[in-house]
Amino acid sequence: MRISLKTALLLGTLFGVNALSMDVAQAAQHKKAKPAVHKKHIRKVSINHVEQWQATRQLAVESGAALVIEQGGGGDTLFQKNADLVVPIASITKLMTAMVVLDGAPNLQAPITISDEDVDLLRGSRSRLQVGSVLPRHTALLLALMSSENRAAHALARHYPGGMEAFVSAMNIKAQSLGMRDTHFEDPTGLTSNNVSTAHDLAKMVLAAHHYPLIREFTTTSDASVEVKGRTLDYRNTNQLVKSSTWDIGLSKTGYIHEAGKCLVMQARLADKPVIIVLLDSAGKLTRIGDANRIKRWIENTSTTRKLMTRA
């Protein structure tokens, strides 16, 4: 008998809690039994079910909005919290930026020049790409996705046929084509809080972006060295989990502005199943990482319980 992961999440909790209740009742019935028999009964049955209940108890995350879905099949929802709340998404935006760039089938070796127009005057975010820097479109895309380089992302959009206005229009058209009905973009970087979406919509965007091999590669690259204006610049991935040996991540993107909080979206294999994770509006430096690890443990524990139930 095959049991889906979603079904296991529901049945596992009920099974564990009901079994625990039965153990309590059985213990009461055997209250007058001999001490040796009573001790043996509790050791053999009750402890196993307590452990199973602990493994399948309800997941709790600290992020303001969250969604976990199975990738492929029916796309079952495994967990959700405020998943339809429309919120700013910060640099998660850059996944859409990358898709629009690649949809245009550009020459990835063509040079991209950083200009004064690419400097962030809204928030004053830092960048090591000085005005006048020239780098291949391929490298600009890598930096935009891996290290969330705002000047690189803005320059990519500015070099789009028709310029910035045409690029942002293409972003919104792409969003609508993916069924992202509660999503709106006004810039390619995510620095504006007017770039908004929901966890449900972003799951659709992650699913779409996962079809692009270059996006998968660049978002999961842990670090890179880039030659710019005679200097070697070292960049790191903004998601520390891509370097973890305990994670199998196929796509990743982080984001942060004050209005959006800390954000993280990922495609990953957990318990040998591909899933999409969306975490929005996280407070604190490590909250989104902590939530991701809690989700990972929860799914892995649930999968173990499911296997036990299937064998039974």
Region spans (language model):
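Short, hinge-like loop/turn segments at secondary-structure boundaries
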Residues: A27, Q130-V131, R236, I295
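Domain-terminus/edge residues, biased toward the C-terminal soluble/receptor-binding domains
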Residues: M180-H184, S193-A312
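Active-site-adjacent loops and short helices of periplasmic peptidoglycan-processing enzymes
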Residues: H30-K32, H38-H200, K204-P213, L270
